[in-house]
């Protein structure tokens, strides 16, 4: 799962996660657009939470 950073680099606080929104199609190249930082990021089919801005958990 690859993440493509949009815009400038964003940093989050230690207790927060980078929240991405999945704009890709299933079983194809997924593009995750950075939505912002959140302390309560819930992962769903269309959302992904990462501990870094590059989605490297």
Curated annotation (Swiss-Prot):
GO terms for molecular function: ion channel regulator activity; toxin activity. It holds the Pfam family Toxin_cobra-type. The keyword Disulfide bond applies. GO terms for cellular component: extracellular region. Keywords: Disulfide bond, Ion channel impairing toxin, Pharmaceutical, Proton-gated sodium channel impairing toxin, Secreted, Toxin. InterPro entries: Snake_3FTx (IPR003571), Snake_toxin-like_sf (IPR045860), Toxin_cobra-type (IPR054131). Disulfide bonds join 3-19, 12-37, 41-49, 50-55. It comes from the Eukaryota. The keyword Disulfide bond applies. Expressed by the venom gland. It is found in: Secreted. This three-finger toxin inhibits ASIC channels. It acts as a gating modifier toxin by decreasing the apparent proton sensitivity of activation and by slightly increasing the apparent proton sensitivity for inactivation. It binds more tightly to the closed state and to a much lesser extent the inactivated/desensitized state of ASIC1a isoform of ASIC1. It interacts directly with the outside surface of the thumb domain of chicken ASIC1a (ASIC1a), but does not insert into the acidic pocket as suggested previously. Belongs to the three-finger toxin family. Short-chain subfamily. Mambalgin sub-subfamily. Negative results: has no effect on rat ASIC2a. Has no effect on rat ASIC3, rat ASIC1a-ASIC3 and rat ASIC1b-ASIC3 channels, as well as on TRPV1, P2RX2 (P2X2), HTR3A (5-HT3A), Nav1.8 (SCN10A), Cav3.2 (CACNA1H) and Kv1.2 (KCNA2) channels. Does not produce motor dysfunction, apathy, flaccid paralysis, convulsions or death upon central injections (intrathecal or intracerebroventricular) in mice. This is Mambalgin-2.
């Amino acid at each position: 799962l690859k993440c493509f950073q949009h815009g400038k680099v964003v940093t989050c606080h230690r207790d927060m996660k980078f929240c991405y929104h999945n704009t890709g199609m299933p079983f194809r190249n997924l593009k995750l657009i950075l939505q912002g930082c959140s302390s309560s990021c819930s992962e769903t089919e269309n959302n992904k939470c990462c501990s870094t801005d590059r989605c490297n958990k």
